């Protein structure tokens, strides 16, 4: 999996059904990881039954390893186990064809899909203001017409809200974060640093002091993509699980309450039922999740998590209120946000200019944090609030696509 600088267009098709369990195959453009799979349980499977299933799995794998000793390199078996909100239970790992066949025969299994590479998606009253904004997107989201250079916002600025950035990490020491950014979880390597830059740029738009929409928000880095901006779908889902648990108080409880948390996923890959179910579990937990629509100039229904209806899917606009030529579109898009030539932070200090729906999504995540700070209800319903506030501004938005551009309600 990677950021939405470029997401891989794909549709998962049912390959076969064995005793009720669907085995899915990736489309022709997916970068599948050899012998790696995600196994998703049926929604009515209890934690006790899930535990019994994984115990059976471990025992079966150990038995086969003993029989095969010395004959070939053994498969790694189960590597990750997921439980999101009691409604999404799954595991991932490395399995051979024979083991996949056995797993698929279990009644508790809903479907099995191949693991694949995911990439980042780059290509009022009492208001205060920021003049001569460093990035045009800030001014655009606080005024009804394009061309402004001032960002108008309430001084509450997202204080008391926590934003989880599921990406390449964050340079938490960057001066523009003012000590409000910290590391949450690293699922990639032993380096708590953003060696790519994508995550820091995204976080800067969400909540940088100078470059961000929610200038008082707390930021948490969840690293699921490597220095090249890539990672596995299974690893991304593990990061989603950690962030949801932390936001709900099940981890360190950074956000204290799910309704005071927002999340951003400026990444995507082929359409994945597993990813979409995990995203829905986050929404069902009462957490607002903004995601990038993707950069293939195609219908976003073919990408995940953009195709999940319960999240807030964001397409990219240009400085003159046009659709960015790379941006995905379609009925799953909820809103447009600035995404072309966006200036934000880079690791080590200073700034960088990037384009992509990766840059659009954090505008919506930051706006979500800002609105919660103003007292708006959090959770997935916040996307409806954002759509209601948005301006009908985008010219030629794409087939069957909204023309709504986000607006913070400043009255300007």
Swiss-Prot record:
Main location: secreted
Record keywords, A-Z: Glycoprotein, Hydrolase, Protease, Secreted, Serine protease, Signal, Virulence, Zymogen
Domain Peptidase S8, chain residue ranges per copy: 135-412
Highest taxon of source: Eukaryota
PROSITE patterns: SUBTILASE, SUBTILASE_ASP, SUBTILASE_HIS, SUBTILASE_SER
Annotated compartments: Secreted
Family as reported in the entry's similarity comment: Belongs to the peptidase S8 family.
Listed name of the protein: Subtilisin-like protease 6
Organism: Trichophyton verrucosum (Cattle ringworm fungus)
């Amino acid at each position: 999996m990677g950021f939405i600088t470029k997401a891989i267009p794909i549709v998962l098709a049912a390959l076969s059904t064995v005793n009720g369990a669907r085995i899915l195959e990736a489309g022709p453009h997916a970068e599948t990881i050899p012998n790696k799979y995600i196994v998703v349980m049926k929604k009515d499977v209890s934690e006790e039954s899930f535990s019994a299933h994984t115990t059976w799995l471990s025992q079966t794998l150990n038995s086969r390893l003993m029989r095969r000793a010395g004959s070939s390199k053994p498969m790694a078996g189960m590597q990750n186990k997921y439980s999101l909100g009691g409604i999404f239970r799954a595991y991932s790992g490395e399995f051979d064809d024979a083991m996949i066949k056995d797993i698929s025969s279990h009644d508790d299994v809903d479907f099995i899909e191949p693991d694949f590479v995911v990439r980042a998606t780059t290509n009022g009253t009492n208001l205060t203001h920021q003049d001569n904004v460093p990035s045009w997107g800030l001014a655009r989201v606080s005024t009804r017409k394009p061309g402004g250079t001032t960002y108008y916002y309430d001084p509450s600025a997202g204080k008391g809200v926590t934003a989880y950035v599921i990406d390449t990490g964050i340079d938490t020491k960057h001066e523009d974060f003012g000590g409000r950014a910290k590391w949450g979880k690293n699922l990639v390597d032993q380096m708590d640093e953003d060696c790519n830059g994508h995550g820091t740029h995204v976080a800067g738009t969400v909540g940088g002091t100078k470059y961000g929409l929610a200038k008082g928000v707390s930021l948490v880095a969840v690293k699921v993509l490597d220095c090249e901006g890539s990672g596995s779908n299974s690893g991304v889902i593990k990061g989603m699980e950690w962030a949801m648990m932390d936001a709900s108080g099940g981890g360190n409880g950074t956000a204290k309450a799910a309704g005071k948390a927002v999340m951003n996923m400026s990444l995507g890959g082929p359409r994945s039922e597993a990813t979409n179910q995990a995203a829905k579990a986050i929404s069902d937990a009462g957490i607002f999740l903004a995601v990038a629509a993707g950069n293939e100039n195609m219908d976003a229904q073919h990408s995940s998590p953009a195709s999940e209806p319960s999240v807030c899917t964001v397409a990219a606009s240009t400085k003159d209120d046009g659709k960015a030529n790379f941006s995905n579109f379609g009925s799953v898009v909820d809103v447009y946000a600035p995404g072309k030539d966006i200036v934000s932070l880079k690791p080590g200090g200073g700034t960088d200019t990037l384009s992509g729906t990766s840059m659009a999504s954090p505008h919506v995540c930051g706006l979500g944090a800002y609105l919660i700070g103003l007292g708006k209800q959090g959770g997935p319903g916040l996307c409806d609030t954002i759509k209601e506030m948005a301006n009908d501004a985008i010219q030629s938005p794409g087939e069957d696509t909204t023309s709504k551009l986000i607006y913070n309600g400043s009255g300007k």
